[in-house]
Amino acid sequence: MTKGIDKYSIDSTDYTVGQDNVQKWGFDVHNPVFGISAGFIALFLVAALVLDAHTAKTALDGLKWKIIGSFDWLFIIAGNIFVIFCLALIVSPLGKIRLGGKDAVADYSFMSWLAMLFAAGMGIGLMFWSVAEPVAYFTGWYETPLGVEANSPEAARLALGATMFHWGLHPWAIYGVVALSLAFFTYNKGLPLSMRSIFYPLLGDRAWGWAGHIVDILAVLATLFGLATSLGLGAQQAASGIHHVFGVEPGLGLQIVVITVVTLLAVVSVVRGIDGGVKVISNINMVVAFLLLILVGLIGWAASLGSIPTTLMAYVENIIPLSNPFGRTDEAWFQGWTVFYWAWWISWSPFVGMFIARVSRGRTVREFITAVLIVPTVVTVVWMSVFGGLAIDQVVNKVGELGANGLTDVSLAMFQMFDVLPFGNILSIIAVVLVLVFFITSSDSGSLVIDSITAGGKVDAPVLQRVFWAFMEGAIAVALLWIGGSEAVQALQAGAISTALPFTFILLAMCVSLLMGMKTERQ
C-alpha cells in the first residue's frame, strides 16, 4: 500500500475504533457522545412536560421560519452544489474507485440494496405527498410554484414538475454526499462508521476530540428527533387512514397502538440485523409498493401513465428556475415548500446517509451515485406521475372528494382518491399496510444508525443498544403525542429542521474532505 493511500487512513492515526467507549450494563457506548445525547433528549422531554406544547411549538416555529427566511439562498445554493458534485463524480475518473478496495464484493444484491436505500430515503413521504402535493400546487392550497395561475393547464403541468423537483435529484444528492463520504472513509480508510470520520482530512486527530464529538452529537439528535417526528406525525396519518378504511376512531389510543406495533416489529428487525431484518422488510416493502403502483396505474391508466412524459418534461424545463433563490416572485411558496423541504432533507441526511453507507460496501463510486441519485429519481417520476396525475385529473373533472373540495386533509388525500376507483377498498388496505411497513423500515434502520454513532463507530455493538434506541424513538413519539398531541410533535419537527443550518456547512465541508481523501486513493 502506498504512502498516498495511507495518508487519511486509520494507519495514519493512533486512534482505534471504540477506544473512548465505556462498557456498562450490557452497553458499549462512546463517552461523551452517548451521555450528552441522552442528556439533551431527557432535557427536551422535561421541557415538553413543563412547557405548554403550544408555547413550545410557537417558539420553535419562530426559530425555524427565521432560519428558513434568512438562509433560503444558502439552502438552495448548497443543494445545487451537491447535485453538481455528485454528477461530476459519476463522469470523473474518481468514479472507478470501489468502496472497500478493488477486490471488495457487494454485500447485497442490487435489488435488495435499492429496496433498502429507497425505503430509508423516502419511505412514507411518497405515500402521502404523491397525491397531496400535486393537488396543493394545482389548486393553490398554499400558493403556487413560480406564481402560476391556480387551476390552469400550466398549473397542472408545473404541479407535477415542482413535486418531482422536491423529491428528485436534489434530496438524493444531499443523501449521496453523506452516504458516499461515510462509506469511503469507513471501507477504504478503515475509520469508524461515524460522522466525525469524514472530517479526518480536514481536522486530523482533532476529529477524535470535541470537534468530532459535536458533529456526532448533532447527528444523533437530528436523527432521533427526525425519526420521532416521523413516527408521531406518521401515526396520526396512519390512524386517519385506518379510520377511513375500517371506521376505527382515530384518537390518541389508536395512534399509540400504531406506534407500539411499529416499534415492536422494528425491535424484532434490529435484533435480527440487516440481513434477517431490515433487508427482508425492505424487500417486502418494495414488492407491496410495486403492486400498488401497478394496480393504480392500470386502473387509471389514461390519466396516470399519460402523466409520465408531462412530469418528466416539466421537471427538466423548470429545474433551473425552481433552483434559483434570487428574484423569486413566489417567495411564500418558495420558502414554505422548497426551502422547508431542503432544510428537512439536510436534517434527515445523517440518518439516511449513514444507513446507505452501511449497506453499500463493494460498489464503485460511479455505480453508487448512479443508484443513489438517478435510479430513485426515475422511480419517483413514475410514482409521482401515476398518483399525482390521477389526483389532478379527479380535481379537474370534479370527481370524488378531491374534485368537490380539493385538498382538505393531507393524510386522507390518497384514500379519497382511491374511494372513486374500482377496487378502492382493496387499494386503501394495501396503502395502509405499506404505510406501516414504511414506518418499520424507518425505525429499524434509524436505530442501527444511532447505535453506530453512539457506539463510537462500531458496527458490532451489543444488540441491547439497538433495542434501546428503537424503544427510545417510539417512547419519545408517544410521550409527545400524550403531552401535547400534534403541536408537541410539530415542535419537535421544528427543532429538528433547525439543525439543518449547521448541517449545511457540515455537508459542504464533507465535499472538500471527500475529494481530499479520494485523491489519495487514486495515487
UniProtKB/Swiss-Prot annotation:
A single BP term in Gene Ontology: amino acid transport
Transmembrane segments: 33-53, 71-91, 109-129, 165-185, 214-234, 251-271, 286-306, 337-357, 372-392, 420-440, 467-487, 496-516
Main location: membrane
GO molecular function: transmembrane transporter activity
Subcellular locations according to the entry: Cell inner membrane
Keyword Membrane assigned: yes
Protein induction: Induced by NaCl upshock.
Short name of any one Pfam family annotated for the protein: BCCT
Keywords of this entry: Amino-acid transport, Cell inner membrane, Cell membrane, Membrane, Stress response, Transmembrane, Transmembrane helix, Transport
Cysteines paired by S-S bonds: none
GO CC annotations, alphabetized: plasma membrane
Membrane topology annotation: Multi-pass membrane protein
Biological role: Involved in the uptake of the osmoprotectant glycine betaine.
Record-stated family: Belongs to the BCCT transporter (TC 2.A.15) family.
Protein's UniProt name: Glycine betaine transporter 1
Organism of derivation: Vibrio parahaemolyticus serotype O3:K6 (strain RIMD 2210633)
